[in-house]
Amino acid sequence: MNTIPRYAVFGNPVAHSKSPQIHRQFALQEGVEIEYERICADIGGFAQAVEAFFANGGRGANVTVPFKQEAFALSDEHSERALAAGAVNTLILLENGKIRGDNTDGLGLTDDIAKRLGVEISDKTVLLLGAGGAVRGVIPVLKEYHPARIVIANRTHAKAAEMAVHFDIDAVPLDELEGGFDIIINGTSGGLSGQLPAVSPKIFEHCTLAYDMVYGEAAEPFLAFARQSGAKQTADGLGMLVGQAAASYRLWRGFAPDVLPVVQYMREL
């Protein structure tokens, strides 16, 4: 019988996921052997795929696009973060056989900004671009840092307005945004196709940090635009990716990985 602990990331598509390499580095830090695989679940077949994984020795799983809401629905119990976000990116098999859903996206983002990059969030004005699942998942943890104001802006304003009411933050139409933001976070997926959010360069004039939740080349169009428009510092989402993975690993195994060397390792791949 295979006694090596099994973990996985579920998504569709998922072949591009860097999670296996990241978790392998965490296991090396802990000094253990784990299995970590990518599982491409069929649209409409996510719940069955998760059930089969846990029935065959799975201990925990990460969940990425487009299954985070479905992961929330199938979880038997939820962390406060997951309840606040309405989405789950981490599934934990409990000793009683039930599945607990958590959301570590917000921890990954705020740890990266506040700890690794050393940028203050409390009493600052934060702009979130986009109103999808990625943004929804980070708002509850951002609020714990007590920023002076959180503003959300999205191509479809109604979606941003709905999220603003839900989280008690502000929504402003993209074309009405002006300056005055300390931290600007791009949570749109436009960078994957080279598109920029339809915003004025003026929004970056007093910006301490422009941050893109995606990483690598996909983040570069937005970050280059931010730099040219006056942002003092820019960062892609690699630290967030490693940070949310580290939080998941800690929930599964009770071991807190050191994020910094893994960010460096992934950057050099």
From Swiss-Prot:
GO annotations of cellular component type: cytosol
Keyword Membrane part of the UniProt annotation: no
Catalytic residues (UniProt): 68
Binding site for NADP(+): 80, 130-134, 154-159, 213, 237
Subunit structure: Homodimer.
GO terms, biological process: amino acid biosynthetic process; aromatic amino acid family biosynthetic process; chorismate biosynthetic process; shikimate metabolic process
EC number in record: 1.1.1.25
InterPro entries recorded: Aminoacid_DH-like_N_sf, NAD(P)-bd_dom_sf, SDH_C, Shikimate_DH, Shikimate_DH-bd_N, Shikimate_DH_fam, Shikm_DH/Glu-tRNA_Rdtase
Catalytic activity: shikimate + NADP(+) = 3-dehydroshikimate + NADPH + H(+)
Single GO MF annotation: shikimate 3-dehydrogenase (NADP+) activity
Listed Gene3D superfamilies: Leucine Dehydrogenase, chain A, domain 1, NAD(P)-binding Rossmann-like Domain
Function noted in UniProt: Involved in the biosynthesis of the chorismate, which leads to the biosynthesis of aromatic amino acids. Catalyzes the reversible NADPH linked reduction of 3-dehydroshikimate (DHSA) to yield shikimate (SA).
NCBIfam families: aroE, PRK00258.1-2
Primary gene name: aroE
Gene source species: Neisseria pharyngis
EC primary class: oxidoreductase
Pathway in which this enzyme or protein is active: Metabolic intermediate biosynthesis; chorismate biosynthesis; chorismate from D-erythrose 4-phosphate and phosphoenolpyruvate: step 4/7
Coiled coil: none
The protein's name in its UniProt record: Shikimate dehydrogenase (NADP(+))
Chain sites annotated for binding shikimate: 17-19, 64, 89, 105, 215
Xref: Pfam families: SDH_C, Shikimate_DH, Shikimate_dh_N
Top-level taxon: Bacteria
Family: Belongs to the shikimate dehydrogenase family.
Keywords (A to Z) from UniProt: Amino-acid biosynthesis, Aromatic amino acid biosynthesis, NADP, Oxidoreductase
